[in-house]
């Protein structure tokens, strides 16, 4: 019976994802989800409180369950590659859910998962450079980094996913995080021209 329950929950999640990709989140109703899944409306409420909970569950099931497992195995780079790949595989869906704003925004859900992923990473590999910056503690650093990753994913999906592959977006993200803009400015040549 438990297996059937898991299959029903997965079916509801799959139909939710398909419908969001086609119609968008705001126009989607619980009835539309249950009709697509071939179940009655009360069945939905056996698994989820509302469509926001489906969105959060899918983020965990489809992406962060596996990403977190890799993080726990101290395979940080693989987990980052997987994160970008998973978003790339379902980019139409993720473009649509990034439009969900307000109290239960997708962006906030994603931020919490990314922050947790980074906490796991730091648990295995403590930060070393914050000693020179006493006003920036580990939490502030991780929050800033999580915001950067979430916004990087959002920008890529909404603006550039048709032009930039998941692998290239991941490489670009790594490059941006390892170089400051000051490292990239051609200041020496500008000064020579003066």
Located regions from the model:
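Basic, helix-initiating cap at the start of DNA-binding domains
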Residues: 1-23, 27, 32
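Alpha-helical structural segments
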Residues: 10-18, 36, 53-73, 78-85, ...
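Short glycine/proline-centered loop/turn elements that form peptide/ligand docking sites
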Residues: 24-30, 51, 130-134
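Residues in the helix-turn-helix
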Residues: 29, 43, 93
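Short hydrophobic/aromatic patch on the recognition helix
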Residues: 38-48
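Amphipathic alpha-helical segments that line or abut small-molecule/effector binding pockets
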Residues: 77-92, 143, 147, 151
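Amphipathic alpha-helical packing segments from all-alpha helical-bundle domains
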Residues: 103-130, 136-154
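C-terminal peripheral helix-coil segments that are non-catalytic and often amphipathic
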Residues: 158-194
């Amino acid at each position: 019976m438990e297996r059937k329950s898991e299959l029903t929950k997965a079916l509801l999640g799959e139909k939710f994802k398909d419908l969001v990709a086609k119609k968008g989140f705001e126009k989607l109703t619980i009835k539309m989800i249950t009709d697509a899944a071939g179940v009655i409306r009360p069945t939905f409420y056996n698994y989820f409180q509302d469509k926001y909970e489906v969105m959060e569950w899918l983020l965990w099931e489809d992406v962060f369950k596996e990403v977190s497992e890799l993080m726990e195995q101290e395979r940080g780079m693989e987990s980052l590659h997987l994160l970008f790949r998973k978003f790339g595989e379902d980019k139409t869906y993720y473009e649509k859910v990034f439009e969900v704003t307000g109290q239960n925004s997708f962006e906030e859900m994603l931020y919490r998962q990314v922050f947790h992923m980074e906490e796991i990473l730091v648990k295995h590999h403590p930060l070393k450079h914050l000693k020179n910056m006493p006003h920036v503690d580990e939490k502030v650093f991780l929050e800033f980094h999580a915001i950067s990753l979430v916004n990087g994913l959002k920008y890529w999906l909404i603006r550039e996913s048709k032009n930039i592959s998941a692998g290239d977006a991941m490489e670009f993200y790594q490059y941006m995080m390892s170089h400051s803009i000051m490292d990239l400015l051609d200041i020496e040549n500008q000064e020579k021209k003066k």
